[in-house]
Amino acid sequence: MAADDHFSLFGLPARFDIDAQALERAWRAVAAQVHPDRYATASPAERRVAMQWSARANEAYRQLRDPLLRARYLCEQAGVDLQTESNTAMDPAFLMQQMQWREMLDEARDDAAVFAELDAELSDARRQMRETLATLLDERHDYAAAGQKVREWMFVEKLAQELAAARPAG
């Protein structure tokens, strides 16, 4: 078994907008081929290789089934260094939106209505980012712009996690 990347491992086109059911079917087929139980009577070297392929298939599936991780993977495969730790440069309008969301998060801890409003705004932001990334990655092949959008989406996901942890009582 040989595969240069996660998509070719599953026989899928390298696209952001993928068929989730086709991914699941392909993963199940690959996982069945390399499952360590199939190699129980094989040599230690063959068992080790099967375990490595199984781990690789599981990691590839984990990354491809999550839209944000899939977008990040596509950008990295295209040579875009996302520099998520050091590159904090973002669109000024997004930075302003970030500040507004942070203020709402502080209020949402004690106010169920603000919580619901912020939750809805973050859901809408995720949907918009998915649509934008589908265009940037699959149609325009603008990986640099997609990388910027991925960094923004990562912020939105982090904020959504903080919001979930701050759910007001009652």
UniProtKB/Swiss-Prot annotation:
This protein's record includes keyword Transport: no
Domain of life according to the entry: Bacteria
GO molecular function: ATPase activator activity; protein-folding chaperone binding
Domain J residue range list: 5-79
An annotated GO BP: [2Fe-2S] cluster assembly
GO cellular component, one term: iron-sulfur cluster transfer complex
Family matches, as InterPro entries: DnaJ_domain, HscB, HscB_C_sf, HscB_oligo_C, J_dom_sf
Record's keyword terms, sorted: Chaperone
Pfam family membership, one: HSCB_C
Keyword Ribonucleoprotein: no
SUPFAM superfamilies in the cross-refs: Chaperone J-domain, HSC20 (HSCB), C-terminal oligomerisation domain
Physiological role: Co-chaperone involved in the maturation of iron-sulfur cluster-containing proteins. Seems to help targeting proteins to be folded toward HscA.
PANTHER family: IRON-SULFUR CLUSTER CO-CHAPERONE PROTEIN HSCB
Assembly, per entry: Interacts with HscA and stimulates its ATPase activity.
Family as reported in the entry's similarity comment: Belongs to the HscB family.
Record's protein name: Co-chaperone protein HscB homolog
Lineage: Bacteria, Pseudomonadati, Pseudomonadota, Betaproteobacteria, Burkholderiales
